[in-house]
């Protein structure tokens, strides 16, 4: 009894599946291009980086009141050690939805250098 049901269902299922699914309109179209929004201005990038730095929880209370500019050094002015700098750069990566390569991250020492790198990255948004 079950043998006949399995035999019938195996013949009917593929044709029913084709009828239900049909051909997709997009199946012949290939979208092989990426769309970019307008690049961020340096002022926008700078303000967002400064906001991330001020919100960074490793900062001492003095940093929130301190004036942060493009000349601000992560180690000297903010007092961040290497691990804190990496955590800050990860927070900046998350803010702009980008990935900063390790070699580049090792060279970023100030807010200005970070802003320049992000502004030149077309994937930043």
Curated annotation (Swiss-Prot):
Transit peptide feature, positions: 1-36
UniProt superkingdom: Eukaryota
Pathway(s) of this molecule: Lipid metabolism; fatty acid biosynthesis
Single GO term (MF): acyl binding
Name of a matching Pfam family: PP-binding
InterPro entries to which the protein is assigned, alphabetical: ACP, ACP-like_sf, PP-bd_ACP, Ppantetheine_attach_site
Location of the Carrier domain: 43-122
Description of post-translational modifications: 4'-phosphopantetheine is transferred from CoA to a specific serine of apo-ACP by acpS. This modification is essential for activity because fatty acids are bound in thioester linkage to the sulfhydryl of the prosthetic group.
Residues modified as O-(pantetheine 4'-phosphoryl)serine: 82
GO biological process entries: iron-sulfur cluster assembly; lipoate biosynthetic process
PANTHER family (alphabetical): ACYL CARRIER PROTEIN (PTHR20863), ACYL CARRIER PROTEIN, MITOCHONDRIAL (PTHR20863:SF28)
Function: Carrier of the growing fatty acid chain in fatty acid biosynthesis. May be involved in the synthesis of very-long-chain fatty acids. Accessory and non-catalytic subunit of the mitochondrial membrane respiratory chain NADH dehydrogenase (Complex I), which functions in the transfer of electrons from NADH to the respiratory chain.
Subunit structure: Complex I is composed of about 30 different subunits.
Membership in a protein family: Belongs to the acyl carrier protein (ACP) family.
Note: Present with 60500 molecules/cell in log phase SD medium.
Full protein name: Acyl carrier protein, mitochondrial
């Amino acid at each position: 009894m079950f043998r006949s049901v399995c035999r019938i269902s195996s013949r009917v299922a593929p044709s029913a599946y084709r009828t239900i699914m049909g051909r997709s309109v997009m199946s012949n179209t290939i979208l092989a291009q990426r769309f970019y929004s307008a690049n961020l201005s340096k002022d926008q990038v700078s303000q967002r980086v400064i906001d991330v730095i001020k919100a960074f929880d490793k900062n001492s209370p003095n940093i929130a009141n301190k004036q942060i500019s493009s000349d601000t050094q992560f180690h000297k002015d903010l007092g961040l050690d290497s691990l804190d700098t990496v955590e800050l750069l990860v927070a900046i990566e998350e803010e702009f939805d980008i990935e900063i390569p390790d070699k580049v991250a090792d060279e970023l020492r100030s807010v200005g250098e970070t802003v320049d790198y992000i502004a030149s990255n077309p994937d930043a948004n």
